[in-house]
């Protein structure tokens, strides 16, 4: 059997214990139309307490199924006795003040326990029963003296101001310690509605649809307990988060104080303390990668700056102190060497021509033979010298012809070399660079192409390039993130 209870909150989160104790125990006599409605759901008396009136109203709405299936806080009573009683076609149980007034219009106070600190009288209550709008609602007065919303949720029995002096004195001993504990807790935040009036709210309507709601422990008697979370399971599933009546949580802050020594008797469980594990990563001062902590780079790999004698790690091309470019960091351009080669060849050829080499002249050899014969024959020195001079004079036109012929052959050779150089320029230039060793290890050839996007750089071996990729290092040349490493083969 599904147990239904009438509550004070919008979603069944707070019971009628928030009502003043004097009003809960006040005997009221329903008017004939309301009495007829109550007796239709099992009421047998003529006078009831406020708890019983709320309970039977909830039973009536449950029995007649006047609530909306989707939005269960809306009650439709246009063609029902409840609509004639309240004078409205529909209402929401969240309209506190409106429903409070409609209920009290149909009640007459029979007996009332008047507490010593109560400022209301019987005539004042009768004005509320008559529906006077100029008077302030008694529960609205309670709202002005509520300590805080967090105290209302944690201690609903202390929210009423209609207590006897003896009851307030009994609870006054408990308040300082509990308030002190609340004061030491850090930034207690409570989300609640503006007013918590004595309203009738249906709780656990959905328990008719599933038998799982029996485990919530709803009491079968009409007395409403002060439990908050036991009866709101089904309503929390149906309503949105914004419809929940009260949610309390704590936010830790640096200014929160520790618990005082007077609270030694109030031991806190492990659930009260929450430990968060935070890992803090300290970033470097610069965006550049540090090679000082790399175990695979030894001091032998460092290079010395020629300007300031500073020892620098192998990868950065510039000195860390004077920002001078490292020597031999980039290979020399082939175009410059090719442009200089013809000039050097011309100079060498001109020197060769002047020295007399590569001149195919048979007379020059005869002159040398005659000189050797002159050294052997001492008698004919003068005659041999004159003959040698004459032979040199006769050989001048032949040597000039040979020089012209050799210069034409040199020009043809230079043209052939230039055509070969042009063909080499058309071919890719990286095979020549790949012959050089790896920039990092200086031992293996450059066969690991560092690819990033549609471009790549060939400046390291495959092993060193894979290490850079594995350590999430950027490209040493352009500082772009490395996408992949390609092992490069050359013919």
UniProtKB/Swiss-Prot annotation:
Record: residues binding Zn(2+): 305, 308, 319, 322
Ranges for region Interaction with USP7: 223-232
Residue segments, region Region II: 242-331
UniProt region (Interaction with MTBP), positions on chain: 170-306
Residue ranges, compositional bias (Polar residues): 383-406
Keyword set includes Metal-binding: yes
Chain spans, region Interaction with PYHIN1 and necessary for interaction with RFFL and RNF34: 150-230
Residue window of motif Nuclear localization signal: 179-185
Disulfide bonds: none
Domain named SWIB/MDM2: residues: 26-109
Keywords, comma-separated and alphabetical: Apoptosis, Cytoplasm, Metal-binding, Nucleus, Phosphoprotein, Transferase, Ubl conjugation, Ubl conjugation pathway, Zinc, Zinc-finger
Biased composition (Basic and acidic residues): 125-148, 164-179, 332-347, 360-374, 407-418
InterPro entries: Mdm2, MDM2_mRING-HC-C2H2C4, p53_neg-reg_MDM_2/4, SWIB_MDM2_dom_sf, SWIB_MDM2_domain, Znf_RanBP2, Znf_RanBP2_sf, Znf_RING
Modified residue annotations for Phosphothreonine: 419
Domain remarks: Region I is sufficient for binding p53 and inhibiting its G1 arrest and apoptosis functions. It also binds p73 and E2F1. Region II contains most of a central acidic region required for interaction with ribosomal protein L5 and a putative C4-type zinc finger. The RING finger domain which coordinates two molecules of zinc interacts specifically with RNA whether or not zinc is present and mediates the heterooligomerization with MDM4. It is also essential for its ubiquitin ligase E3 activity toward p53 and itself.
Name this polypeptide is given: E3 ubiquitin-protein ligase Mdm2
Organism, as annotated: Felis catus
Gene that specifies this protein: MDM2
């Amino acid at each position: 059997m599904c147990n239904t209870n009438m509550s004070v909150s919008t979603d069944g989160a707070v019971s009628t214990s928030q009502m003043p104790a004097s009003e809960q125990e006040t005997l009221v006599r329903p008017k004939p139309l309301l009495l007829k409605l109550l007796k239709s759901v099992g009421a047998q008396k003529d006078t009831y307490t406020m708890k019983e009136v709320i309970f039977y109203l909830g039973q009536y709405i449950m029995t007649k199924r006047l609530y909306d299936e989707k939005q269960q806080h809306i009650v439709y009573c246009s063609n029902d006795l409840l609509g004639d009683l309240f004078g409205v076609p529909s209402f929401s149980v969240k309209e506190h003040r409106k429903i409070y007034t409609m209920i009290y219009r149909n009640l007459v106070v029979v007996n009332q326990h008047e507490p010593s600190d109560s400022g209301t009288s019987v005539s004042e209550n009768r004005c509320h029963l008559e529906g006077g709008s100029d008077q302030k609602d008694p529960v609205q007065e309670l709202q002005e003296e509520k300590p805080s919303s967090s105290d209302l949720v944690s201690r609903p029995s202390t929210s009423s101001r209609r207590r006897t002096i003896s009851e307030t004195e009994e609870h006054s001993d408990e308040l300082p310690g509990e308030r002190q504990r609340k004061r030491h807790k850090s930034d207690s935040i409570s989300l609640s509605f503006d007013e918590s009036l004595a309203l009738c709210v249906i709780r656990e309507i959905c328990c008719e649809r599933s038998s799982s709601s029996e485990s919530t422990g709803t009491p079968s008697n009409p007395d409403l307990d002060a439990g908050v979370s036991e009866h709101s399971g089904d309503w929390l599933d149906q309503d949105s988060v914004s419809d929940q009546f009260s949610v309390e949580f704590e936010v830790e802050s640096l200014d929160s104080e520790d618990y005082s020594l007077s609270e030694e008797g109030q031991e806190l469980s492990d659930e009260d303390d929450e430990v968060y594990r935070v890992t803090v990563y300290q970033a470097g001062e610069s965006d550049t990668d540090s090679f000082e902590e790399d175990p695979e780079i030894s001091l032998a790999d460092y290079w010395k700056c020629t300007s300031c004698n500073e020892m620098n790690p192998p990868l950065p091309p510039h000195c860390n102190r004077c920002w001078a470019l490292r020597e031999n960091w980039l290979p020399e351009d082939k175009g410059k060497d090719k442009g200089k080669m013809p000039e050097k060849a011309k100079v060498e050829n001109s020197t060769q021509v002047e020295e007399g080499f590569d001149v195919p002249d048979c007379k020059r050899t005869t002159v040398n033979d005659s000189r050797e014969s002159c050294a052997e024959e001492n008698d004919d020195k003068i005659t041999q010298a004159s003959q040698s001079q004459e032979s040199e004079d006769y050989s001048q036109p032949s040597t000039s012809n040979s020089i012209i012929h050799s210069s034409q052959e040199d020009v043809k050779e230079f043209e052939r070399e230039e055509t070969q150089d042009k063909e080499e320029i058309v071919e890719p230039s990286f095979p020549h660079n790949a012959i050089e060793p790896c920039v990092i290890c200086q031992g293996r050839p450059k066969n690991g192409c560092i690819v990033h996007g549609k471009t790549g750089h060939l400046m390291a071996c495959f092993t060193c390039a894979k290490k850079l990729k594995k350590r999430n290092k950027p490209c040493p040349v352009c500082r772009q993130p490395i996408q992949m490493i390609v092992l490069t083969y050359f013919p």
